[in-house]
Amino acid sequence: MRVVTASLRGELLAVDEPTTVETEYGERKLAELQLRPTDGTDTDGDVTVDVTLWAKWADTAAHAEAGMDLVVTDPEVDEYQGEVTYSTTKESYVVLEPDFLVDVTAIRSWVQCPRMYYLNKLSAIPLNYPVVKGTIVHDVFGDLLRGRDLDAAIEDRVAEAGLELGLLGRDVAEVEGEVRGNAAAIEGWLAQGTLTDEDAWRSEYTLISPTFGLKGRADALRRGMPVELKTGKNTSREPRFQDKIQAAAYALMLDERGVDVDTGTLLYTKNTTLERTEESGDLSPAKEFTMGKGLLEFVVRSRNELAAMEARQEVPTGYEADAKCEYCFEQDTCMVVSGRLDQESKAGAVGRPIPDEEREYFERFYQAIEAERRAVHDEYRKLWEQGDQERADDDRALIGLEPLGQREIEGNRWELRARKPDDAVSKLREGDVALASEGDPVEGHAELCRITELGEEVVVTTDEPVSLQRLDVYPSELSVDRMLTALHDTVLKSNDDRKDVLFGRREPAFDDGRETFIDNNEGQNRAVNLAVNAQDCALIHGPPGTGKTYTIARLIRALVDCGDRVLLTAFTNRAVDNALEALRDQGFEDICRVGTDTGIREDMLDVQLETRGDPHERAAELRNSPVVAATTASCGSRVMREQSFDVAVVDEASQLTEPSALAALNLADRFVLVGDHEQLPPVVQAAD
């Protein structure tokens, strides 16, 4: 494998259909394209060039359209009568829409079935035991790579997952035993003689590829080779094909950095728990495979299909792949979604379509959310398009940091410290997830980190140490993903009565009760009465200075007195904590605050939900709290999505997009929106 050293890039102006021609080597497939180069050539913006894609790269032309961007690496350049033409070579890769950074796990899903990729976007990873145990095993894997004692690592990581395990009703000893069984494969493999003192390990390694349009976090790198951990079993000699795809995608990104990757390893940890008398085949957990050029090309072509579909804003049907629906564990879900949204699907469809207005609502917001995703990808692109000073001037990075040291801290993580220049400012905030690097966040060594202090000194925590010389805003698709899930849950899972109100088919209903909750302000008292008597929803509007926060606190107390469990939420941590402060000022303390140490105000940390510890105690604290407070973003987490409330009270509602608000409203039977539409509107990144 060779390093990518040259490329042609530009906007497609015309795309011909693939065809077959006779050459001196026999029949070959090709496709002709017309491109306006944007870099990689000496031509200016008015010049167009012809590009020939040979062999399997011609298949990419079937997915390309005028207006898309294209990259051809290592092209052959010919000139005839003043005309410059380009064509692919044996070393070439062809990349469609390289600015759309496809996550490696998305390609894995796409290769299994494009329809599965789509379904995974709509429905978030649920809170279930295999997912939680898998996370624990992965964390133990990282600990063992750093030389930590196995028993200590297992005990610590199981305790770390205490809340989730408690919500699932799991016993600590049982979980530790199962994790130990999986970890035996890791420990045994690390003890093999194939590993030497010269082996350099990195775990959870962040990779970004501007050339291939890829991003992801490799489970581990050993001497630059990707190692992927799977908590399931595989008794075949070869790794599963979709697992090879995942490792090969990391190899491509490493190749772009000049790392010569020719081998990948898949570690199936459940194999060590199998009994030879019960299972046949190859029970060895570690399965290595060779990274051939054909496999790497297949990864890029698959990625191109996905990126092209997203560029066309289409929904996959499943016919794009050879997957057999009858063997798919998502078949039933696929058929239900297809039936309800009236979509074409290889698996077929069941059920009646939802009303046209609901389907139109879903499609409109689906496209709006995906536009937001593309805006996030534009921010990724700035990581390599903008220079150091340009990013600093744009407040997107802190540069010129002076490293002050690093130390290992609790949880087998690292604390990094650096001094920042006196005049340095940025959009970074304490609690943010950012990208810490030695100076080049894309081609150099970089680690995802969480900012814990941001004053004269910068303090961050990471999984692995790095010399902290630069800190960049790291774009995240988490909010986009959670908005999609909220949209899916509202349209496809909400009961018809709730949707009748949301879509205006029925007026909200109210009881006739009347009490005095606030005796010195009739407007506030009327607002509390309205909300308490709401059978469906209520809107409370109040300009600045009208006492909305005080009213919210009194409303929550009244709802709890009625026996309701209440979700208090808002777009920002600041708004949530301000409402909590007002509630506590009124003497109410039976509160559970969901969030991180860096996100929650210091004087509210005493009511923070502790996620670490005894599973039953952690789960009981959350379940038994009559008032749970969290941001709307946190409402989309897998823990919060398992909770149910009688009423959701949403402060500063005007700052929320509809899908962001739905993440909270989906958790409650009734809701109250509080805010002022004349104040701050929702924050969005997409221009549309």
Spans of features found by a protein language model:
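Metal-dependent nuclease catalytic cores that hydrolyze phosphodiester bonds in DNA/RNA
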Residues: 59-218, 245
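Single-stranded nucleic-acid-binding OB-fold domains
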Residues: 1-68, 75-90, 98-101, 211, ...
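Accessory interdomain/linker segments of ATP-dependent helicases and helicase-like nucleic-acid enzymes
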Residues: 1-27, 331-441
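ASCE P-loop NTPase motor cores of helicases and related translocases
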Residues: 465-628
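Pre-ATPase regulatory/linker segments immediately N-terminal to the P-loop/RecA-like helicase/translocase core
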Residues: 272-289, 293, 298-306, 430-520, ...
